[in-house]
């Protein structure tokens, strides 16, 4: 249903730098911690295990009374939240590698009186950080457009701006989640229960599981705290009555506060999905993402959808409906709707969308491309901003090749537009390499921690030839442009420069700052080109970044290209772009994935088009000849099984829905684990949304969105993948073209080691 009426915003007030503010206060759900340090006070109630300490994290030289001390033994390089004595606690997995000077403490990488590697020492020595006579809380100093060892916040221009790359300090801001308890009726009187382990939970943490039936007192189900997994199968439930499940962490033999409960209704059907009914039906094209919109520690679902088909700029068809951005609770409650209007054509290239807490208030914002005619969640319409007397820029073919374009940020709680700025300028359509809009209309967005601590917004326009990337910060209710980059391809039409139909983010070179990755091309956090394969016909649809080759240090990239050439399918070193191995292709490889799917092997297995349907090991050797998952359109991997190998989905559904399949390495074949049934549509998201560390599958039907979750008992446990910075960033790409799937910044698979604690700090209240 299209909104009609409501107030019209005719442009708002233009501030410095062309930023248009549309009013409305930014969410005030919690102050932003700059670096995670508490400047005084003692934690007197005990540190929340896995959450923020509400009484202040170990004041300088102070102690935490009743708190929990988490040093190197409670998870690789755990954070000392109970204070540090002389010499301090040594963080072996974080930014400070030498401990704290006498009586000092390390909070977010700032060493007070000690030596910080990558941080700033107040009166101490600094290696790779910004020392400006005091301590840098949360990373390099970012003030007024100058760059002190980090990212320039005022500079812009071709190639970007900024000083020398250094090692970042300071913990990354991350969502403060609840335990994400889920209960699924498996039939036969069995209920599967799963929950989250947080990124900063101590390695020794255990959990008790409780069930309250029909409102009676909760009963503990396990004999001793569960430490091997974060799931449990309840074989004694009376499913004819309602059952509320919760968990309670156990640390050092002491039970902590209980989680929020998940209630399985009486006579709940034996199905392994949550149903989110669409406010109105007719879904034809959809993509989805998740974020904690209201700061309650639970993910909400943001669905971008249309009754029109998914229009590709290269094979244009006229959109028959506008695109909606709907927000829902996972219990199906509708929250709000943004109608993007007729100037945003129906299709993933036209409507990039992000869901992320970009201002550090503990609540996710929704960020998308908009134009005149867009209606926000409170009914306010963007009006005639340029005074040309029109707000509909469709031509006779239904294409939109002119008119104002914006990036808008919406408040997660109600969809109110908080602020907007101009999108990357279209200029002349032919600047991008054609006259039809195929290239100028291909647009992407992402989130990257360019200073190593705070999320920045990345917007990108153009593939094939001319490409422009910009970086923005949204802090304190204002947008500021950090830098702009372009590849110098303006007006070129024949060449395919290094590019991809998707973006990925990650710390490619290990300096603590994120890079922006475009397949055969990487941009440094400063906005400079980090490396470029400088390929002719260098464009591809998919690529993936992770620890794909465990024997090597650092990250690798598996990428594919669209045109016949040597190394058209290749593994690269993410820090340098060096080709580690490659395969010659005779045409468009179309798709490609790299993930650990064969439990007999170690590292990633790789599959793609144009390589004879072979399955390759991480080093390029063929391990299954002509029978890879690519045969029969089995593509996107998902963590679904009990162990650490990934299963494989049908990315595109057939008549009987989306399948999840287990790969059998010995026979080079697939075994079906689950199928979603007839009428289901294309996969929208694969991410760790609920329960334990394994992933959920989000798919669409004409009238509902379904969130499928595994009920296979786990054989091990990990902290939630959403607390791994690189995984979380790349899940953020899921409501865009060729989202693929995400990988953490550690090796996850057969023969893995316990992953180090992530270098994060929670933003928002504990849950």
Q: Language-model segments: which ranges?
A:
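Ser/Thr-rich, Pro/Gly/Ala-heavy low-complexity intrinsically disordered linkers and tails
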Residues: 1-169
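Short beta-strand elements bearing conserved aromatic residues within extracellular beta-rich modules
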Residues: 207-209
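Beta-propeller-forming repeat regions
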Residues: 171-179, 188-190, 197-202, 216-220, ...
């Amino acid at each position: 249903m299209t909104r009609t009426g409501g107030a019209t915003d005719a442009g708002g007030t233009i501030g410095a730098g062309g930023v248009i503010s549309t009013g409305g206060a930014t969410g005030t759900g919690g102050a932003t911690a700059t670096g995670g340090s508490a400047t005084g006070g003692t934690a007197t109630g005990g540190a929340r295990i896995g959450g923020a300490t509400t009484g202040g994290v170990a004041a300088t030289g102070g102690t935490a009374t009743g708190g929990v001390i988490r040093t190197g033994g409670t998870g690789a390089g755990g954070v000392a939240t109970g204070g540090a004595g002389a010499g301090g606690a040594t963080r072996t997995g974080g930014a400070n590698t030498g401990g704290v000077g006498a009586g000092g403490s390390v909070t977010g990488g700032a060493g007070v009186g000690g030596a910080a590697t990558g941080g700033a020492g107040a009166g101490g020595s600094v290696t790779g950080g910004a020392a400006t006579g005091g301590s840098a809380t949360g990373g390099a100093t970012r003030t007024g457009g100058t760059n002190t060892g980090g990212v320039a916040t005022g500079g812009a221009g071709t190639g970007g701006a900024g000083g020398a790359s250094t090692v970042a300090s300071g913990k990354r801001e991350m969502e403060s989640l609840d335990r994400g308890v889920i209960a699924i009726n498996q039939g036969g009187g069995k209920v599967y229960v799963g929950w989250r382990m947080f990124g900063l939970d101590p390695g020794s943490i255990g959990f008790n599981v409780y069930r309250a039936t029909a409102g009676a007192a909760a009963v503990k189900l396990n004999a001793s705290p569960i430490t091997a997994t974060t799931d449990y199968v309840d074989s004694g439930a009376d499913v004819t009555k309602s059952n509320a499940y919760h968990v309670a962490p156990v640390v050092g033999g002491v039970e902590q506060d209980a989680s929020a409960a998940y209630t399985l209704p009486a006579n709940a059907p034996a199905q392994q999905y949550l149903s989110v009914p669409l406010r109105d039906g007719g879904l034809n094209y959809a993509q989805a993402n998740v974020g904690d919109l209201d700061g309650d520690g639970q993910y909400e679902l943001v669905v971008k959808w249309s009754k029109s088909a998914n229009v590709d700029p290269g094979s244009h068809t006229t959109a028959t409906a506008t695109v909606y951005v709907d927000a829902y609770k996972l219990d199906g409650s509708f929250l709000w709707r943004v109608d993007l209007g007729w100037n945003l054509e129906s299709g993933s290239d036209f409507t990039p969308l992000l869901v992320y807490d970009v201002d550090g208030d503990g609540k996710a914002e929704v960020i998308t491309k908009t134009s005149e005619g867009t209606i926000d969640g409170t009914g306010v319409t963007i009006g005639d901003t340029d005074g040309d007397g029109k707000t509909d820029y469709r031509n006779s073919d239904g294409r939109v090749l002119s008119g104002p374009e914006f990036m808008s940020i919406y408040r997660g709680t109600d969809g109110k537009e908080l602020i907007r700025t101009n999108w990357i300028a279209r200029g002349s359509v032919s600047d991008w390499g054609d006259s039809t809009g195929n290239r100028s209309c291909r647009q992407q967005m992402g989130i990257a921690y360019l200073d190593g601590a705070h999320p920045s917004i990345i917007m990108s326009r153009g593939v094939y030839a001319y490409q422009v990337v910009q970086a923005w910060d949204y802090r304190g209710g204002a947008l500021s442009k950090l830098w702009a980059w372009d590849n110098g391809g303006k007006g070129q039409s024949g060449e395919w420069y290094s590019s991809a139909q998707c973006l990925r983010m990650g710390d490619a070179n290990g300096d603590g700052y994120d890079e922006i990755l475009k397949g055969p091309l990487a941009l440094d956090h400063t906005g400079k080109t980090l490396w470029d394969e400088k390929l002719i016909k260098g464009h591809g649809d998919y690529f993936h970044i992770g620890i794909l080759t465990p024997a090597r240090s650092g990250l690798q990239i598996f990428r594919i290209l669209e045109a016949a050439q040597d190394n058209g399918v290749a593994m690269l070193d993410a820090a340098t772009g060096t080709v580690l191995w490659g395969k010659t292709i005779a045409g468009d490889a179309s798709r490609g994935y790299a993930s650990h799917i064969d439990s007999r092997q170690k590292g990633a297995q790789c599959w793609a088009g144009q390589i004879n349907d072979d399955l390759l090991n991480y080093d390029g050797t063929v391990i299954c000849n002509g029978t890879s998952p690519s045969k029969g359109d089995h593509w996107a991997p998902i963590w679904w099984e009990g162990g650490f190998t990934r299963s494989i989905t049908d990315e595109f559904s057939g008549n009987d829905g989306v399948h999840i399949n287990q790969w059998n390495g010995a026979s080079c074949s697939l075994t079906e684990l689950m199928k979603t049934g007839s009428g289901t549509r294309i996969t929208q998201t694969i991410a760790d949304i609920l329960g334990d560390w394994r992933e959920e599958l989000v798919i669409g039907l004409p009238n509902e969105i379904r969130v499928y979750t595994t009920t296979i008992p786990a054989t091990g446990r990990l902290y939630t993948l959403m607390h791994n910075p690189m995984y979380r960033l790349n899940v953020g790409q899921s409501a865009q073209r060729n989202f693929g799937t995400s990988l953490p910044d550690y090796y996850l698979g057969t023969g893995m080691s316990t992953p180090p604690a992530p270098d994060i700090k929670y933003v928002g209240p504990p849950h």
